[in-house]
Regions:
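Glycine-/small-residue-enriched capping loops at alpha/beta junctions
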Residues: 1-103
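Solvent-exposed alpha-helices and their adjacent loops that cap or buttress functional pockets
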Residues: 7-11, 58-60, 102, 138-141, ...
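Accessory terminal and edge-of-domain segments that mediate assembly/interaction
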Residues: 13, 23-41, 142-155, 160-176, ...
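Short glycine-rich phosphate-binding loop at a beta-alpha junction
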Residues: 17-18, 106-112, 147, 202, ...
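Gly/Ser/Thr-rich loops at beta-strand to alpha-helix junctions
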Residues: 22-24, 113-120, 153-155, 207-212, ...
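A glycine- and small-aliphatic-rich helix-loop capping segment at beta-alpha/alpha-beta transitions
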Residues: 33-37, 124-135, 166-168, 217-228
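Conserved catalytic-core helix/loop/strand module for nucleotide-ribose chemistry
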Residues: 46-79, 171-301
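Phosphate/ribose-phosphate-bearing ligand recognition and processing surfaces
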Residues: 72-179
Length: 301
């Protein structure tokens, strides 16, 4: 279970949960994301007995969108935080069933339910205390990765406090499978955490940070450009033995400027940032350095 600050409609996940009510009213930025005006109702959707159903108009190549009926009336006894947490398990189960298996757990994103127009804005602590324990249980039982996407730093800090309380007394090695180097990794993680809290850490992002969002690593990008330049297999293997900067210089000579720019524009195009960018952008770091041409980290910030 991960916790980040950001925009759930922009995070690169397999599916995300969109809160609505029994009449399919969509509000705020959620409405804009699916082409509606805030407060407008979705047409051609019917609840099938479940509080979670897939949005029929999900776009190809984009994360699936699942609707959650979290609507309630004033004075409704269901206003308790558990009313909102109860949609997490059916969302995770249904979304996983609707995705093609890839060999790795799917990443499913959940907003802080009930704190916008849901009526729990004045009691967000209750929501965090209900959502996070349920997410921990569901992540394990359904074998999925879940990310709670908070809107803003204050929301993130509140969620992190609740998560710290949940895991108090448990070691990092117990919570995370770090393999045989767990001792070294835990020590280093604690050191970096202290630096981040003191705002003494500068982030350095390489191409691997963007790979999770579907962008190529530098070598894969160079291989794609070499393919566009129609290099033979022998020449490609010889090229790969060179420093990547030398590879780029040679490929630039093989392709005309416009063709090279078209290839780069096509290969470096991404609409959603990955979990890595979301986690890094959520750290209290004042500065960041990157060798990347994409703007995914900026989007996550």
């Amino acid at each position: 279970v991960h916790v980040v600050a950001g925009d759930i409609t922009k995070i690169g996940c397999d599916a995300w949960l969109l809160p609505t009510d029994g009449a399919f009213t969509i509000s705020g930025a959620f409405a804009e994301e699916i082409g509606l005006e805030s407060g407008q109702r979705l047409a051609n959707q019917v609840w099938d007995g479940s509080r979670v159903i897939r949005l029929e108009q999900s776009l190809a190549g984009r994360p699936q969108v699942w609707l959650a009926n979290v609507g309630r009336n004033p004075g409704d006894p269901r206003n308790e935080g558990s009313w909102y947490a109860d949609v997490i398990e059916p969302f995770a189960r249904s979304a996983k069933e609707g995705l093609e298996p890839t060999g790795v757990p799917p990443l499913l994103a959940i907003p802080v339910l009930g704190t916008g127009d849901g009526g729990m804005a004045a009691d967000k602590g209750t929501i965090y205390r209900e959502l996070l324990p349920e997410m921990l249980c569901v992540a394990e039982s359904q074998e999925v990765d879940l990310v709670l996407v908070c809107w803003g730093r204050r929301s993130l800090s509140a969620a992190q406090r609740v998560r710290r309380d949940l895991v108090a007394g448990r070691s990092l090695k117990e919570l995370w499978d770090m393999g045989p180097k767990a001792e070294v990794l835990v020590t280093e993680a604690q050191r970096l955490g202290e630096l981040a809290r003191d705002r003494q850490m500068v982030l350095f992002l390489g191409a691997g940070a963007s790979a999770g969002a579907g962008l190529p690593t530098w070598q894969r990008l160079l291989d794609d450009i070499a393919d566009e330049a129609k290099l033979s297999q022998d020449n490609l293997e010889a090229l790969r033995r060179l420093d990547m900067r030398d590879q780029a210089a040679i490929l630039e000579q093989r392709l005309t400027g416009s063709t090279l720019h078209e290839v780069l524009r096509d290969r470096l195009k991404a609409t959603e940032y990955g979990l890595t960018q979301g986690l890094l952008a959520s750290l209290p770091s004042r500065e960041a350095i990157t060798t990347n041409y994409d703007t995914l980290f900026e989007s996550a910030c």
